[in-house]
Amino acid sequence: MLILTRKVGESLLIGDDISITILNIRGNQVKIGIKAPKDVSVHREEIYQRIKQALEAPHVGE
């Protein structure tokens, strides 16, 4: 795992087309902005896990 330190307004790049910018830091919360191509899915981890579980669940009527 790569660990970086960033200040408000600073960014990091993933590849050539994904940018993550620190927008605000308040207490233990960090607000980030993500710029990515439309074909790249961006989800919070807990939402991604729900989507994954729903796709893996057996469908009713099959």
Curated annotation (Swiss-Prot):
GO MF annotation, one: mRNA 5'-UTR binding
Keywords, in A-Z order: Activator, Cytoplasm, Repressor, RNA-binding, Translation regulation
Major localisation: cytoplasm
SUPFAM superfamilies the UniProt entry points to: CsrA-like (SSF117130)
Subcellular location: Cytoplasm
GO biological process: mRNA catabolic process; negative regulation of translational initiation; positive regulation of translational initiation; regulation of carbohydrate metabolic process
Entry coiled-coil feature ranges: none
Alphabetized Gene3D superfamilies for the sequence: Translational regulator CsrA (2.60.40.4380)
Gene Ontology cellular-component terms listed: cytosol
Family as reported in the entry's similarity comment: Belongs to the CsrA/RsmA family.
Function recorded in the entry: A key translational regulator that binds mRNA to regulate translation initiation and/or mRNA stability. Mediates global changes in gene expression, shifting from rapid growth to stress survival by linking envelope stress, the stringent response and the catabolite repression systems. Usually binds in the 5'-UTR; binding at or near the Shine-Dalgarno sequence prevents ribosome-binding, repressing translation, binding elsewhere in the 5'-UTR can activate translation and/or stabilize the mRNA. Its function is antagonized by small RNA(s).
NCBIfam families: csrA, PRK01712.1
Name the record gives this protein: Translational regulator CsrA
Record gene name: csrA
